[in-house]
Amino acid sequence: MILIGMYDSPFVRRVGIALRLYGIAYEHRAWSVFGDAMKIMAYNPLVRVPTLVLDDGEALIDSAAILDALDEMVGPERAMTPRSGATRRAALKTCALAAGIADKAVSLVYERHVHERANPAWIERCAGQITRVMNQLEIARAAQTTRFWHGDTIGHGDVMVSCAVTFMRDALAGDMDLSPWQALKRHTDMCEDLPEFRETYMTFKIG
């Protein structure tokens, strides 16, 4: 397998962490959507990362779809998403909320540092969305008594939350105060201390 994309993307990183947690060997091609667009285009016409190329040449796109495929590959006993019912729905919601704030954080970075003129209304909108979701995730995590979000084994929600919060720490340093969300901080610190997280950490840089 080939994982395309740089680990400073929370979406590429969540896939890299899942592959490591599953013990699936892969080649990592740290291509940038800016500097390596033509290379990525050969596998993904959207020129987006992550892209995961399977051994038979099939290219999977979108991190959620990639994780769904990986869950299927390893089987229901090892899958990092619960099989069914309310627990599954809750886990998928955690993933969706965390992916949403990561997406909004990326939008903020582009608005502040890539666009020639920042749009204050758009910045306010994105920051408000992030704050509301972080508040909801904080309440949910603080209510959990288990080591991980939905039990004693790590799930995709744990990974996505940690990747999103770490990205915001790095990319939005000075722009957002993360101190109100102490349960999320503890969760992220715990996850980031795991080898699979350390091995995929990349300091975020513009350009």
Regions found by a protein language model. Name each.
Residues 67, 71, 92-95, 134, ...:
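Non-transmembrane alpha-helical segments in soluble domains
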Residues 98-187:
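GST-like fold's C-terminal all-alpha helical module
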Residues 78-83, 107, 147-151, 177, ...:
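Short, hydrophobic secondary-structure boundary micro-motifs
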Residues 1-121:
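GST-like domain detector, emphasizing the conserved glutathione-binding G-site
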Residues 36-39, 76-77, 118, 144-145, ...:
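Glycine-rich, flexible loop/turn motifs
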Residues 178-207:
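Long hydrophobic alpha-helical segments typical of transmembrane helices together
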Residues 20, 170, 193:
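Short polybasic/polar patches that bind polyanions
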